[in-house]
Amino acid sequence: MKKDRKNIILQSLASMLEDRNLSKITTALLAEKSGITEAALYRHFPSKRSIYAELFSFCDDAIFAKCNELKKNKMSAKDKTKNAFVFFMMFVEKNKGFARLLSREALSTNEQNVSDNVNQFYERFELILRQILKEDAENLTTQPGISAQLIVTAIEGNISRYIRSK
């Protein structure tokens, strides 16, 4: 039951993040959306920051699990990179609330550690792309590091554009 409530809270937050008109998500609003009291919310999470951190952790786990799966695959580096990019964009499209989290738009200064985690997430994603691209470096027109930077920049740009278009 405790795990179920935690998941309900996380799903409620993800759903609330999809609403661009909701400028600030308070614990009172989150508790109401989750169908629990604010006190019950704090029994599951010590702070609002920890709720955001756990939601981000879900996103992080999903994307890096796919990246690690792709790294082990026997397909070409080009196909691995393409699949990582497509998976990332489809994940954000399917989980619209994560777009605001990954763009840091939904985070306030109180969630600075989550914002730092997002920065580290992009750095790790870029590192994985660089490692994949090094497998086929001789067939690239640019260095693997530059290609990885361009892909991550394109992802961040697409997420920003996606948010603006909502």
Residues covered by each model-derived region:
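Short amphipathic alpha-helical elements of helix-turn-helix/winged-helix folds
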Residues: S12-M16, F87, F91, A154
